[in-house]
């Protein structure tokens, strides 16, 4: 046994130690029986000797890792953090689709009954034309409602500044924004835009020109802004059955000559109604709608060319003005009731 090894020696000592120690060596194995007779005696006679603990041994090799344990339950939710600063505002998103039309609203309550009156008293039948409006104090150019008859009202453009005012404009060309190469039905009802170009409508022109004698004035302006005009003592057209036949009085005055008298007595023609007396279809050949004969000396409903054009007589032409190869920038045709004395300018 190495000197640093731990050991225990237990000696059983008899209750009487005298002489026993010396005799121990002479006895045999059979003489080693203890002299104590009771467990108590033997126990209290034991002597236990213990040395100091030895040096710890070298650590063993680590064992292998055990298997991964089960996932624990989630911990409780923590308190909300402090709100951060607002971010930069993003760009506006694309416009959404148009929503469905809403439900129709409830019908309103019935209004109070108006006062009874005769038709002659209720309608301002004295406002039959632009001249009547001028005499009532209306001095601005613009659109007004008039009553050519007690049963009929219409919205018309009044020129209150040219040659004393009171002119009702039924045709205007100024920028080419409206197509004038149209069918019969369009010219019958009228077309165009209030703010630019329009034709009032042959049915309305017939009604207006058959309620008293109407003078006619035509104003033109070229692309150099040189203004010219022509006036006629009277102007009227027939109804649709008469194919809106033109009846024109004498040429009165102006600085662009007379290029309308040739059309006097002729029916109106459009690209789908050939009422001229030519072997060709004048409205189709000259891209307009007019009182064509064989075919024209004027074509104020022709194509909107910008000044000089190579094509023949299919623009806004006035023969005694700038001829068949020049299309005017501006043109209008207007009427007002005939006066006993007329001053033109």
Curated annotation (Swiss-Prot):
Disulfide cysteine pairs (residue numbers): 130-158, 282-295
InterPro entries: Collagen, Fibrinogen-like_C, Fibrinogen_a/b/g_C_1, Fibrinogen_a/b/g_C_dom, Fibrinogen_C-term_domain, Fibrinogen_CS
Bias type Basic and acidic residues, positions: 86-116
One Gene Ontology term from the biological process aspect of the record: complement activation, lectin pathway
Signal sequence extent: 1-19
Post-translational modification summary for this protein: Hydroxylated, possibly at Pro-80.
Keyword Protein transport part of the UniProt annotation: no
Limits of the Collagen-like domain: 57-114
Subcellular location: Secreted
Tissue specificity statement from the Swiss-Prot or TrEMBL entry: Expressed by the venom duct.
Domain of life according to the entry: Eukaryota
SMART domains linked: FBG
Sequence similarity: Belongs to the ficolin lectin family. Veficolin subfamily.
Disordered: annotated segments: 48-118
Pfam families documented for this protein: Collagen, Fibrinogen_C
Protein's name according to its UniProt entry: Ryncolin-4
């Amino acid at each position: 046994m190495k000197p640093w090894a731990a050991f225990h020696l237990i000696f059983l000592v008899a209750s009487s130690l005298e002489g026993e120690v010396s005799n121990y060596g002479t006895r045999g194995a059979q003489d080693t029986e203890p002299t104590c007779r009771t467990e108590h005696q033997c126990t209290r006679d034991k002597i236990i000797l213990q040395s100091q603990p030895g040096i710890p041994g070298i650590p063993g090799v680590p064992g292998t890792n055990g298997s991964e344990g089960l996932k624990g339950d989630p911990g409780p939710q923590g308190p909300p953090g402090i709100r951060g600063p607002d971010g930069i505002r993003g760009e506006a998103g694309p416009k959404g689709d148009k929503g469905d039309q809403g439900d129709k609203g409830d019908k309103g309550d019935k209004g109070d009954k108006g006062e009874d009156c005769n038709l002659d008293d209720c309608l301002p039948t004295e406002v039959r034309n632009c001249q009547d409006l001028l005499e009532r104090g209306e001095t601005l150019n613009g659109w007004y409602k008039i009553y050519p008859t007690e049963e009929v009202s219409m919205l018309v453009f009044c020129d209150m500044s040219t040659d004393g005012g009171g002119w009702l404009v039924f045709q205007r060309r100024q920028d080419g924004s409206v197509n004038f190469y149209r069918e019969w039905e369009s010219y019958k009802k009228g077309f165009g835009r209030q703010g630019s170009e329009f034709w009032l409508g042959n049915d309305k022109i017939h009604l207006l020109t058959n309620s008293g004698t109407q003078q006619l004035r035509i104003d033109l302006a070229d692309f150099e802004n040189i203004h010219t005009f022509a006036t006629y003592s009277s102007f009227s057209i027939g109804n649709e059955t008469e194919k809106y036949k033109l009846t024109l009085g004498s040429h009165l005055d102006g600085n662009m000559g007379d290029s309308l008298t040739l059309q006097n007595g002729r029916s109106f023609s459009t690209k789908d109604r050939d009422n001229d007396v030519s072997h060709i279809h004048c409205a189709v050949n000259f891209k307009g709608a007019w009182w064509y004969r064989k075919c024209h000396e004027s074509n104020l409903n022709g194509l909107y060319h910008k000044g000089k054009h190579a094509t023949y007589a299919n623009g806004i032409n006035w023969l005694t003005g700038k001829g068949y190869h020049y299309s005017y920038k501006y043109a209008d045709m207007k009427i007002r009731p005939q006066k006993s004395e007329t001053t033109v300018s």
